[in-house]
Regions:
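C-terminal motif of bacterial Sec signal peptides marking the signal peptidase cleavage site
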Residues: 17-20
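Hydrophobic faces of well-ordered beta-strands that scaffold small-molecule active sites
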Residues: 49-55, 93-95, 129-133, 171, ...
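Substrate-binding cleft of secreted/luminal carbohydrate-active enzymes
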Residues: 219-224, 231-369
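Boundary/entry segment of secreted carbohydrate-active catalytic domains
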Residues: 25-91, 96
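Active-site groove signature of glycoside hydrolases
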Residues: 130-140, 159-192
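An active-site-proximal structural segment forming one wall of the substrate-binding cleft
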Residues: 110-128, 145-172, 196-208
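Aromatic-lined substrate-binding rim segments of carbohydrate-active enzymes
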Residues: 77-136, 213
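Aromatic-lined carbohydrate-recognition surfaces of secreted/lumenal glycan-active proteins
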Residues: 170-181, 202, 209-227
Length: 380
């Protein structure tokens, strides 16, 4: 009781001091950004969240995996993409380190120097890595080589101190290593066919990952291989590499209403969650491997899904403005799709008090691309 009385007296004196001393007291009223405020229609450069790039580095060959002749060094593709997407306020880079040349071997000092140069460039650009290690660049049995379980264990043990030294530039580590693009399918040695092998690899990836950094997994099924009471389970989040909204054979069984979808909804609020749309060729029905027709991906429903599953980052290079485009892709349509306060309130999605108006009170139109850009990992 004495403590309560003392607190009330101090509070009263403090209030009296501020109300009696007119000089030096400033009152500020804060509000949301109006559409016609300076930079009111531009994206915020939010650290560790928002849109991300994707860069794949062949660690042994020291070049960009998908166009080594055009980008024969370690960082030129990263620099080009950073400039190309600068207007989209990108602070993250999904960083693929392909260890193909280290299959059957130990990682060398030169391998670590190569990865270190890439990390240093990220630092200088003010960006962080959504980090994934992989070995295989082909699927459907086309890979020419791939790691064994022993290769992966050896490399994770070598990588552990290196990642600890560079944790300042790592936002999250994705559980790659297995199969095509590190997506846990189509591996050369069939590693994904054994639950014991997948569990062992996931545990070693968790040990490799610096303390304070989450691990993201492709589908909840793989996370569920672990004991739910284990520390490893408690630090694992998700990355969805095939966001198409409607059900598709390649969606990993994660379309809305499935147990996997609902697990992500439940477990994602306190974790970074990453994702991407398929490439534009899928939407344009130009992917010869696609087992069924593609489509333009709905922007409003994508925003709703990102909200429900608490996404932190989304690839801005998929289905948007890829080089040498001859078509208009999904995200370009998003820029033409208005988003309304009614839609947001109906779906219990956040909206700032000034987002849809100008300073004079008139209504400002916003599109779903801008809404996702401005809220991803921050308010959704």
């Amino acid at each position: 009781m004495k403590n309560i009385a003392t607190f009330m007296l101090v509070s009263a004196l403090t209030l009296g001091f501020f109300t009696s001393c007119d000089s030096g007291v400033q009152h500020r009223t804060f509000r949301g950004i109006y559409a016609d405020d300076p930079a009111g229609m531009e994206g915020l450069y939010n650290p560790e969240r928002g849109f991300r790039l994707e860069v794949a580095l062949d660690v042994t060959e020291k070049n960009y995996v998908w166009a080594p002749e055009e980008y024969p060094d370690i960082t030129s593709y990263l620099e080009e993409q950073s400039e190309f997407y600068a207007s989209d306020s990108v602070s993250l880079v999904q960083t693929y380190f392909y260890l193909t040349g280290a299959v059957g071997k130990e990682l060398t000092g030169e391998d670590f120097r190569t990865m270190g140069i890439f990390f240093d460039k990220l630092r200088s650009l003010g960006k962080k890595a959504v980090l994934r290690f992989a070995y295989e660049t082909q699927f459907l049995g086309r890979a020419a080589t791939g790691p064994t379980l022993e290769d992966i264990i050896r490399h994770t043990e070598q990588l552990k101190p290196f990642l600890e030294e560079n944790k300042d530039v790592i936002q999250v580590v994705q559980a790659g290593m297995i199969g095509a693009w590190g997506e846990w399918h189509s591996s050369f040695h069939g590693l994904e066919k054994s639950d014991d092998t997948k569990r062992t690899i996931l545990q070693h990836i968790c040990r490799m990952t610096p303390e304070g950094r989450a691990v993201q997994i492709r589908v909840p099924e793989y996370k569920n291989l672990l004991d739910t009471a284990s520390n490893d389970y408690k630090r694992i989040s998700f990355h969805d590499d095939f966001i198409v909204i409607k059900k598709h054979q390649w969606d990993g069984g994660m379309s809305e209403g499935t147990p996997a979808y609902e697990q992500i909804v439940r477990e994602s609020p306190c974790f970074p969650v990453d994702g991407e749309l398929p490439w534009e060729t899928w939407s344009m029905n130009e992917d010869p491997d696609n087992p069924e027709a593609g489509w333009i991906i709905d922007g409003l429903q994508t925003a709703r899904r990102l909200f429900l599953q608490h996404f932190t980052s989304l690839s801005v290079i998929h289905n948007y403005k890829e080089k040498n485009t001859k078509d208009k892709y999904s995200m370009m349509y998003w820029k033409e799709t208005p988003v309304s306060t009614e839609f947001l309130r109906e779906n219990k999605m956040p909206v700032s008090d000034g987002y849809f108006i100008r300073k004079d009170g008139s209504v400002a139109e916003r599109n779903v691309f801008d809404y996702i850009r401005d809220h991803l990992g921050y308010r959704i």
